[in-house]
Regions:
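Compact, charge-rich alpha-helical regulatory domains located at protein termini
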Residues: 1-48, 54-60, 64-93
């Protein structure tokens, strides 16, 4: 893993990052899914390696879920904070 990568959940509102890795081994232990299931779901909604993400908003309770703009076409998705932990991004300055 590159040292400058952060989980998506660590970005600030308005901050952008490039997806560099999706690693289910980083999934919190309280999330029970079959191996590969969460990664498949994330890929299906368009979060793939090398796509740009922008954090748009955090939910009111525990900053959960996180609203994220995916790519440059304006697609917005919401993802649970604990699931966003497996999406490793390289922050864009």
């Amino acid at each position: 893993m590159q040292t400058n990568l952060l989980p998506l959940s660590k970005l600030n509102k308005g901050q952008k990052g490039i997806v560099r890795q999706i690693d289910e081994q980083l999934l919190p232990h309280d999330v029970e899914l079959e191996a590969g299931e969460l990664e498949r779901q994330i890929l299906e909604i368009g979060i793939i390696e090398n796509v740009e993400l922008k954090v748009l908003h955090f939910g009111l309770i525990n900053r959960d879920p996180i609203a994220v703009q995916v790519g440059g076409d304006g697609t917005t998705i919401a993802i649970r904070r604990n699931e966003s932990e497996i999406i490793l991004v390289e922050p864009i300055k």
